[in-house]
Amino acid sequence: MARGPQSDLPVGALHGVERRTGRDSAERVAEPAACPCARDAYRPLEAGRPLEAERPCPTPQYTGFGTATAANARYQQLVSRGTTALSVVFDLPTQMGYGSDAPLALGKVGRSGVAVDSLDDMRVLFGGIPLDRVSTSMTVRAPAALLLLMYQLVGEEQGVPADRLTGTIEYDVLTEYMARGSHIFPPEPSLRLVADTIGYCRTQLPRWNTVSFSGCHMAAAGATAAQEVAFAPADGIAYVRTSVAAGTDVDDIAPWLSFSFAARVPASEEVAGFRAARRIWARMTRGEFGAEHPASLTPRLGTRRYGALSAAHLPEANRMTADIEVAVVELLSRIEELGGAVGADGARPDGEEPCAFLLVDPAVEARQAERMAKLRAWRSHERVGAALTGMRRTAAGTGNVLYAMKDALAAGATVGEVCDALCEVWGTCTPRGF
């Protein structure tokens, strides 16, 4: 029997009901939106009804330019064309909790996303964007709580009630220790900060999705399909366990969590992995925590392109015409011209293909540092200092640190200053080699 290239598990020519053993097949597969939710988190549409009429599916464009001003121009353009979902990517210094004027941020400001150092930057980033009419996804982990609070503060300035703000923070910080390395604090206080964020959102931002478990990043770091499906729920259970221990009910937590897995080939292995993840999650949340709400047992799941399969040169997808035979012959002729059936990385076009790269102006870094200098000049240093002291005191205790963190950000504290203050209490993390 052949074995799957991603999972290394036996793959038969046909997997029917007779292969399901140990449990009744109906119990293991169930109907869509029914526990254990192996098939889908939503019920199927009625026959004949268009998808948009039943459940609109906005597709946010992953976007973040060097400065808040440049990124805002892009968001304004997207919203003017009907977009109702935005996806913000931050630069590496912001993801690591550094200010744009920090020595370790040199050469990285605005390179991989938008630089956000303070509430003032967040105001510019979402200036003119009606936050009650868009859903915003923020791809950030270690400092996610800070950026979420800034977003809430901008919403308050717009007069938008907190219960009208919707979006997602991809707050799977444990992934950083395993796959990416963009962590700030040691694992234990990082878990606490996630739990504090979950508890805060359930009372202050009730429509916010708090954590998306990033199996896709584990896959990009080398995890097999089975490892990806095992590690992501393991992270999720750690967050739920910490939040429940802090006093949050599991049915107030689990419905606002989701999975993000890699989309690989063959699709059959990925579909099997997705179904397995849903079954495992339902059993774990109900078995260990006593979850009862249907949404707690039917997790939402999304996929992303598995980046490891991408190459510098990929053949374009060709539309098949009615005369498919002619199209196939043309493709075969082209393949022969390229030297036969070779790998994607082996084929090279004649000459250089035109490719427009996004070049970040080096002046972005200087302008961002200048903005921070102006901020420090006009803000109240006494108010900022008192707020940071209060946040340190809360971090050293057992209270929810987000309330004190929000006060510090509202006073004008920067991302770097807030992270530095927490590092004074919690320390930093330098992982040991394997």
Over which residues does each language-model region extend?
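A glycine- and small-aliphatic-rich helix-loop capping segment at beta-alpha/alpha-beta transitions
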Residues: 104-106, 153-158, 185-188, 230-231, ...
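Glycine-rich anion/phosphate-binding loops
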Residues: 65-80, 142-153, 187-193, 230-231
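Long, amphipathic alpha-helical stalk/connector segments used for oligomerization, subunit docking
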Residues: 311-347
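Core alpha/beta catalytic barrel or barrel-like domain that forms the active/cofactor pocket
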Residues: 46-63, 85-101, 111-112, 121-144, ...
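Acidic/polar, glycine-rich intrinsically disordered N-terminal extensions of enzymes
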Residues: 1-121, 125-132, 155-160, 348-404, ...
